[in-house]
Each structure stands twice: as C-alpha cells, then as structure tokens.
C-alpha cells in the first residue's frame, strides 16, 4: 500500500510541475532526477560495447529500447510466454500450450511444474562491458508482495568481468493457500588472457521456490465460481482441495568452462583443449500437515522429498580450419544419484556413472552455415543418443531461411521411472523405454510476409501421468488425484505452424503471432489446442519534445478449447484428463508503456474483459485463470 501511495504522489507531483512551470519539459525531466543520459555522453562508449553472451549462443549487447517485444518479456520468466498458460498467481506453474523438448541426450528435467522457473546452465548470462552496469526491475504482484530482479556487472579489467544477480518474489494470491515465493541468486565470472590463449567462465546459481498448494477448486467451488455470484467475487471464499500443503524446490549449481589455445597459425587455423565441469543438486519436496482423501491413506507424516545430484565432466578438443570449419570432439562423463522419499529410512534410488562421445561441426559455404552434432552413449542405459543437422542462409538479402533435422533418444525423467510417497498408493518403479523424437523443421524470415516456421515431429515412447482410477472420495462426486505412470506404445505425430508479422500504419502498428498445431494419435496422451493467437494493436510516439517515448494499445490472446492437462501438486507435474475442456475464452489487456532516458515504465490492465465473457476461464480444469488486475513496473539501467 505504501508503494501505491508513493506512486500516486510522484504522478501528482509531476502534474503540479507541469501546471506551474513555464518550461514544463525541463521541469519534467528534472523532477524525476534525469540530468544527462549516460549513453548520450560522447565520452562514454557505444551501447554496442556492452556485450552479453551465454555459453552456447551468439553475443548480443544491452538493449534499452522500448519495443513491443520487450513488453512480451516483461513478466516473471522474463521470456516471451506466448506458448505458456499462466496460473492465477505469480510464481506458480505454467500449462504448456505447445509441445517442446530439450534438444539434449541427457535425461529430461523431472517435475515439469518447476521446469519453466528453473535456470539451467545455458540460461546464465556473462558480460564484457566498458563501465559498470546496474539493472533494476520492479513489478507489482497479485496481492501482498512484489517482484524484483537486480543485476550488477563490472569489468575489473579489460579481461575479467563478474556479475551478481538476485531475483526475489513473494505473492499471496487471490485464492486460499496459494502463496508463492522465490529467491534466485546468480554469480558469474569470465576471464580471458591478454593474448586470448586462455579463457574461463564460471557461475554459481542458487534457487529456492516455495509454493503453497491448494490442489485447485473443489467441484462445488467450481460451480460457485462459474455462477458469477457476487458473493464469490472475493476468490478467497471459494473452497479448495488442500489448505495445508506446500511444495519446495531447491537447486544449487557450480559450473566452469575453460579453454586453452594450444596452436594458432597465421592462416587462422587453431587447435584448443577445453573442460566443462558442472556439479548440481536438486531437491523437490511436498509437505502436508494431514493426509488427504484425494490421495488415499498414508503410512506416516506427509513429507515426500526427492533428491537428484549430478556431476558432469566434459573434455573436448576444438579445431578451427578454413578448410574443415569448426570441428569439436568431446567426451562426457555423467554421474548421477537419485533418491525418492529421501527422508524415509526405506528410501529408494539409484546411482550410476555413464559416458558418451560427441562430434560437432560448423562450416560456412556458399553463403550458408552448416552445423551438425552427433552424440553416442557408450556406457549405461539412461543417457540417450543425438543427431542434429541445420542449414542457415547467411546472406544479407531480405529473405533468410533455415532448415534442419533432429533425431534423439533420451530418458523421460527419473520421476517417471521411480517415485515413492508416504501415500500408500502413490508409488511406482518402472522399466521405461527411452523417449524418441524425430524433428524436421523449416523457418523463413522475410520483410514482406514476416516469420514462418514449420515443425513436424514423430514422438515414440511418450511417458505421461494419468489417474489410477476414477473412484470418488465423497458424496459430491469428487474424484481422487492418485497418479500413475504410463507410456504410449505407438507414434504421436505432431505438426506445428507458426507465423509472426507486424504491420505498421504510420504511428500505429498491429503485431501478430498465430500458431496452428495438429496431433495425430490413437489415444489422447498429448493434448494441445489447435489454435493459439496473440494480436497487439498499439500506438507509439515521442511526446514532451521527445523527452518521453510512449506505447499504448491492446493485446488480444486466445487459444481454442482442448482437454488440458491437470496440475497434480504431489508429483509437481501434470496428468492427462478427458473430462473437461478449457479454452475458447478471449483475454484482452490494455497497456501504456513509456521510456525516459534509460528507464522503461510499464502499466497494464490485465484481462479487462473478464467480467463480460463470464467465469469460464481456466489455466487447468480446476485452477481458474487470472481475473481483471492492474499491474505496473519498471526497468532501470545505470551505466556508470
């Protein structure tokens, strides 16, 4: 409440300043503390010298512009979440609207509800900057809390940089027992010698996520919710399945990647050796004060904890040659230890050591970049195999394209294989086949018709959760939530078509993203909407003698009806269901964005049509989507 008052005071003060001062523009910029744009100072370096790079991606630079793409990424994940369906509270899970996969032969990430929030080693940023950089992000939440993301990075010398990042969030939410909280700390460094013969990148990540789990609305509360009775506009009056359950996800990782140049010739040929080390611990737990009929009887106190510890060492050689291109050969040693019901004296698990070898190639020829990778498991049965091929056009014409093929096998996730709970009926040990995916893709970018992409995937041995049975637990007909694992023996055929294009009409623009997808299967094990669309119509202009740049408009989101997976908090995953379809409801947002110097301000009224279209909006069958809500925030960059 104090922040809201402060925000109103600032806005009111600005208005008073405009009314009273004969030079309102100067008074406006001075009133909010801007004297000189640090990057407009001719003595300071260009913004393009503030470099950002990840371990396996191209180098970019800090971008302080205000674009519609920045609006799409101004969220909890700080990623465009077009293909994800948010739950009602910040920090909760997301329901996937498309099928995606990790293009790796390593076992898939267990506990899918935590996957989107999890920061993996390829998500960590490294920096190389001429002056210290600070970035502050603030965004309001649903109720009683806030979301902040802070970054500080500096080069102590031309060759060494370190950065510290902290993301914190706490939000009570509007429904009972749905509080969420996050603490995420990232520390990264990178160093290269003056002659560029040696470089090393390191990072440490600590993530701690807490979610109060209510299991969704009861059947009676769903009826009350959809009735639009004014008594239940206060969502905390709706009954939920659990009032005393909490899940925790903790993760820590130590990572370094070092490379030494052994040979470099005048003709740009070079040979180097490298080593990547990664040690990671992951804990996922579900605690409940009293057992619930939704999961049956329990042998003792509900405190299910699953542990996963991994140590990986990758040794590689890299050859750069004008004739062969970039060639890399690597050897991976992967150690893992998995325990389920880890707090019990009778816990189960497995501990293994597996190895694989990989060969990668990248070469430019005839205005095209050719890249490929082959990885083969040598020892063990949980590492898979991988084959990637990609062709990119690299000419400077108005049309660019890429096409490729991915063929991989991988473990579906350790929790599909082995899981044990204090609930007597929630326990399994399975001998699963490796998931197999064949993916053929094509993408073309054109200034004329935008971006078009096509993916066609064949999926074999798809593992999934479903309910053990449809037994009821009370006179109201409530069905239990006891999960079990199954594996689809036939092939799932998946087609995805995506089109993105922005049309401009002077200072107005219409930004469009449309996804069409089709799934061919004998059983409904992969359930997705056929149509997803996002359309943003907005106006942008410089105002106050170019002291401020604004964007304002409406965003329309929609996905067609489908049998969405239901969130199951005990296993931190989703199970399939065929009883209730969700979707088919429009979501309309109104926004006003502004940029002053290096500060971007965001104001959004979310789901403004919620009271018009009726209470038929859900994130999963028993979890309602977000009501109308006004939120605001900012991103502020400092460069000295």
Residue locations for each model-derived region?
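Bacterial Sec-dependent N-terminal signal peptides
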Residues: 1-27, 271, 604, 628, ...
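Sec-dependent signal peptide cleavage junction
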Residues: 16-74
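Coil residues (strongly favoring Ser/Thr
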Residues: 27, 37-38, 58-59, 63-64, ...
């Amino acid at each position: 409440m104090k922040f809201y008052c402060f925000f109103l005071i600032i806005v009111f003060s600005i208005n008073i300043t405009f009314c009273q001062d004969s030079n309102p523009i100067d008074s406006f910029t001075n009133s909010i503390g801007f004297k000189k744009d640090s990057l407009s100072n001719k003595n300071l370096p260009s913004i393009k010298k503030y470099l950002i790079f990840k371990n396996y991606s191209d180098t970019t630079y800090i971008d302080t512009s205000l674009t519609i793409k920045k609006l799409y990424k101004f969220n909890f994940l700080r990623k465009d979440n077009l293909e994800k369906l948010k739950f009602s509270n910040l920090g909760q899970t997301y329901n996937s609207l498309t099928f995606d996969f990790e293009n790796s032969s390593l076992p898939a990430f267990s506990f899918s509800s935590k996957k989107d929030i999890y920061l993996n080693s390829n998500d960590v940023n490294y920096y190389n900057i001429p002056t210290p950089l600070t970035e502050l992000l603030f965004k309001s939440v649903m109720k009683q809390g806030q979301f902040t993301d802070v970054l500080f990075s500096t080069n102590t010398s031309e060759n060494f940089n370190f950065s510290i990042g902290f993301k914190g969030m706490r939000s009570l939410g509007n429904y009972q027992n749905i509080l969420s909280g996050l603490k995420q700390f990232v520390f990264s460094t990178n160093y290269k010698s003056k002659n560029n013969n040696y470089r090393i990148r390191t990072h440490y990540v600590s993530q701690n996520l807490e979610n109060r789990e209510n299991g969704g609305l009861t059947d009676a509360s769903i009826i009350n919710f959809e009735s639009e009775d004014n008594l239940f506009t206060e969502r905390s009056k709706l009954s939920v399945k659990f009032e005393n359950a909490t899940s925790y996800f903790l993760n820590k990782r130590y990572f370094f990647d070092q490379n030494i140049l052994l040979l470099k010739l005048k003709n740009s040929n070079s040979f180097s050796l490298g080593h990547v080390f990664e040690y990671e611990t992951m804990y996922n737990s579900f605690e409940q004060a009293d057992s619930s009929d939704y999961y049956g009887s329990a042998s003792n106190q509900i405190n299910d904890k699953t542990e996963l510890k991994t140590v990986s060492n990758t040794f590689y050689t890299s050859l750069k040659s004008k004739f062969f291109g970039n060639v890399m050969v690597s050897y991976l040693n992967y150690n893992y230890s998995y325990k389920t019901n880890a707090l019990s004296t009778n816990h189960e698990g497995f501990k293994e050591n597996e190895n694989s070898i990989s060969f990668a190639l990248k070469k430019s020829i005839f205005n095209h970049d050719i890249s490929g990778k082959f990885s083969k498991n040598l020892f063990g049965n949980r590492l898979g195999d991988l084959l990637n091929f990609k062709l990119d056009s690299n000419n400077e014409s108005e049309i660019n394209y890429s096409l490729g093929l991915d063929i991989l096998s991988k473990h579906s996730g350790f929790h599909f294989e082995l899981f044990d709970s204090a609930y007597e009926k929630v326990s399994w040990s399975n001998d699963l086949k490796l998931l197999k995916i064949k993916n053929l893709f094509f993408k073309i970018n054109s200034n004329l018709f935008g971006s078009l992409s096509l993916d066609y995937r064949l999926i074999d041995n798809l593992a999934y959760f479903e309910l053990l049975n449809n037994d009821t637990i009370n006179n109201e007909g409530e069905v239990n939530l006891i999960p079990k694992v199954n594996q689809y023996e036939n092939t799932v055929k998946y087609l995805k078509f995506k089109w993105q294009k922005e049309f401009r009409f002077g200072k107005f623009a219409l930004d469009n993203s449309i996804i069409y997808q089709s799934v061919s299967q004998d059983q409904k094990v992969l359930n997705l909407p056929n149509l997803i669309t996002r359309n943003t119509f907005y106006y942008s202009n410089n105002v106050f003698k170019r002291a401020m740049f604004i964007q304002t408009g409406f965003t329309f989101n929609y996905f067609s009806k489908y049998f969405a997976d239901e969130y199951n908090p005990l296993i931190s995953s989703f199970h399939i269901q065929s009883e209730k379809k969700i979707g088919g409801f429009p979501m309309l947002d109104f926004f006003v964005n502004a940029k002053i110097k290096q500060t971007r301000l965001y104001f959004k009224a979310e789901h403004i049509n919620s009271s018009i279209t009726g209470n038929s909006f859900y994130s999963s069958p028993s979890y309602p989507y977000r009501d109308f809500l006004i939120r605001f925030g900012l991103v502020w960059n400092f460069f000295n």
